[in-house]
Amino acid sequence: MNSPQPPDTTAAGSVHTAPTYTLRQLVMYFLRLGTLGFGGPVALAGYMHRDLVEAKQWITDADYKEGLALAQLAPGPLAAQLAIYLGYVHYRIVGATLVGVAFVLPSFLMVLALGWAYVRFGGLTWMQSVFYGVGAAVIGIIAISAYKLTKKSVGNDKLLWFIYLVLVAVTVITESEVAWLFLAAGVLVWFWRAPPKWLRQGKMNAFAATPLPAASGMMSTLDWPLLSQIGVFFAKAGAFVFGSGLAIVPFLYGGVVTEYHWLNDKQFVDAVAVAMITPGPVVITVGFIGYLVAGLPGACVAAAATFLPCYLFTVLPAPYFKKYGKLPAILAFVDGVTAAAIGAITGAVIVLAKRSIVDIPTALLALVTVALLLKFKKLSEPMIVAGAALIGLVAYPLLHH
């Protein structure tokens, strides 16, 4: 009774035993994971299970599985949402908030430092050389991610394959991402697999696209209209990241490059490369993009706006997830959205490859990256990116001077 414990009765009626760890211990664990956790969302989720469920036994396997299911069901980067949910299990809103910040903060600070270096030294040969190699390797990495996601999530379902191929085509042709197609895909699968009564009676509603805000302004450190625009755009982007953080890439490209012209193609590919060489969630690349657009304020606004939907989509439904999370309509909706997101990722690989594969050496580097990742399953992306950077440092000066 001497140490206060948070209430532990869930909305679903189950009662957790008192936690065997302090909130400080949990926050420090996620601070360390955010600093050293390379390998992408699947690897990060695996680390959490290994450490928190198996080794430390702070979290039960049932709670972990519920968090993983919610992270797959709701919009938001999988690893960040799972971390937030695990913080919520015993320490509710305070735990979810502190864990979320601790998990994201290390990689955010890293991309800020890389953003400063990119702006400060971007015109120098060595910086151009690094990204010459890394940009090509990133194409190979994303291609393998798209392949694995397609194989795992689309499977043999003909309707999901239809949605997937439509989104690939739309992304390649328009070189942008139409947000409402994600929702339309989810509703289509929902209505097909688990149609509501009113639909079976022959009634149908129409769906309308929600346009993105118009582009405006030049870069300015404290340009409030620009910062507001950044906030609105990245909040929308954060709301359409299903499963893998890579799902945000085509959406960002459509807004940041094609519509708003905040960055050019090369800068955008470099931003994706930064996400690959830093630990923590891939989505943190938004901090790098925000820094290039509007300095430190832009980085802070972009990161906060992107992760706010992730946080809300985890904390708000958490008490009710046990009761409603396995409804056929919800599961069908998520399958549709996931197929659409993976199709957009695959289309983005093609779009970005046209910008990053500029000659025979970069084409070979991308192909070698794909071959290595297929051959050596445990080979980490940061190792590949580091090797590509070294190749770029050697090859770029020889080929361009």
Curated annotation (Swiss-Prot):
Gene Ontology terms, MF aspect: chromate transmembrane transporter activity
UniProt keyword annotations, A-Z: Cell inner membrane, Cell membrane, Chromate resistance, Membrane, Plasmid, Transmembrane, Transmembrane helix, Transport
Cell compartments where the protein resides: Cell inner membrane
Main location per the UniProt record: membrane
Gene Ontology BP terms: response to chromate
Membrane-topology annotation of the record: Multi-pass membrane protein
Upregulation: By chromate; induction increases when cells are grown in the presence of high sulfate concentrations (3 mM SO4(2-)).
One Gene Ontology CC term in the entry: plasma membrane
InterPro entries: Chr_Tranpt_l_chain, CHR_Transporter, Chromate_transpt
Membrane-spanning parts: 26-46, 67-87, 93-113, 124-144, 172-192, 214-234, 237-257, 272-294, 299-321, 330-350, 356-376, 379-399
Protein role: This protein reduces chromate accumulation and is essential for chromate resistance.
Family named by the database record: Belongs to the chromate ion transporter (CHR) (TC 2.A.51) family.
Name of the protein in question: Chromate transport protein
Organism: Cupriavidus metallidurans (strain ATCC 43123 / DSM 2839 / NBRC 102507 / CH34)
